[in-house]
Design a protein with these regions (language model features):
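Conserved Class I S-adenosyl-L-methionine
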Residues: 139-163
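A short SAM/SAH-binding and catalytic strip from SAM-dependent methyltransferases
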Residues: 99-112
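Conserved N-terminal segment of class I S-adenosyl-L-methionine
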Residues: 1-91
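Conserved acidic residues
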Residues: 51, 99, 126
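A short, conserved alpha-helix within the catalytic core of class I
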Residues: 109-124
Length: 176
């Protein structure tokens, strides 16, 4: 079943769950599938002198389980699912100024609004870490687009597999 944005938003606000244990946010938040992200993000922060991070799409924070990360971290989501997550619409207004915006498994849900969202990100951060797919990745859903962000951002400066092979990659771009 393919839901419209409005229908999906309504389901989420009513407490829709992904049906997975430990998280309401889907497979991309499971500890097994976030292992590489939890490993490389602190390394990238050290390598590029990143001291502050906005997590744009933090969800229920399940993905960070057990992660040691010595940075100034602020979590945002359109529908906060954890007390430390603040409500924010990344498609409508720039995030507070930070070194890095982390937007893992989020842009893929807002495909028509990706260009305007990336323009807002460029106003807010020096770097972006986001989910990346190759240009030949097959589309499987109208709720999750396998986006090749190189179309808007060029080649990333870092790339790592993000979860199982079909989950795509976590890539890092310099925004300005």
């Amino acid at each position: 079943m393919n839901l419209s944005d409005a229908e999906m938003f309504e389901r989420m606000e009513e407490g829709w769950r992904s049906g997975l244990p430990r998280t309401v946010c889907g497979g991309g938040s499971l500890p097994l599938f976030t292992e590489n992200a939890r490993r490389v993000l602190p390394l990238w922060c050290a390598r590029y002198d990143i001291e502050s991070v906005c997590d744009a799409g933090a969800g229920d924070m399940a993905w960070r389980e057990g992660m040691l990360w010595n940075i100034d971290y602020t979590a945002y989501d359109l529908i906060p699912r954890h007390p430390s997550v603040q409500r924010w619409d990344i498609t409508a207004e720039p995030l507070p100024r930070v070194d890095l915006i982390l937007c893992r498994m989020v842009l893929n849900h807002i495909q028509p609004r990706v260009p305007q969202t990336l323009a807002l990100f460029k106003q807010s951060a020096h770097y972006l870490a986001a989910t990346q797919y190759g240009d030949d990745a097959p589309q499987r859903s109208k709720q999750f687009y396998r986006l090749d962000l190189r179309k808007w951002l060029g080649e990333p400066i870092e790339v790592v597999q993000d979860g199982p092979e079909d989950f795509g990659q976590l890539a890092l771009w310099r925004l300005g």
